[in-house]
Amino acid sequence: MKRRSFLKILGSTLGATLLAGPEQARAALFTSPVTTNRLRPPGAVPEEIFAGKCIRCGRCVEICPYHCITLLDIRHGVFAGTPLIAAEKIPCYLCMKCVDVCPTGSLIRVTQEETRMGVAIIDRFNCFTWVGMTLCRTCYDKCPFKDKAIVLEELKPIINESACTGCGLCTHACPVTVKEGKKAVNIEPLYATAKVKY
């Protein structure tokens, strides 16, 4: 990124947050970017300590062979420079290389099966199979843990939350785009909001 582009982004971001008022500006700087289909890499510690633990080295981004991990820019306040996966664009293929290179323990070493980035949630009002439009098994076929994390009951996909890794392969493959980039199956980052036990 060129200096001019950086300063433009910085200026527009600071200007927008200051115009919104001091309370909104403060909230924007500390609001987690982890939301529906926006996930931390595998093995990430809970969000409330992630920004303090991650040193923003970018090793996870460099090592990812699928280029699914990106670093957040300055518009994300205290989370700038931390890694994020946009599951509907490029999902996590669970190669686990990012976990191996993390020097701080922000990404804890877990197996593929133990990974919990989030949980897939099927929107039964928009899923082709659930509304009876056609027989679609795309999410089932793409799941690396089919018949464990996702099963077919009466040919309809059902998520087993205890086995779902939240990798986003189902979301990425889903042919239905609803609104604001959401699909008929989306990943909710439930584990990122877990409270740290001291």
Language model feature labels by segment:
Residues 1-198:
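Non-ligating segments of multi-cofactor redox enzymes
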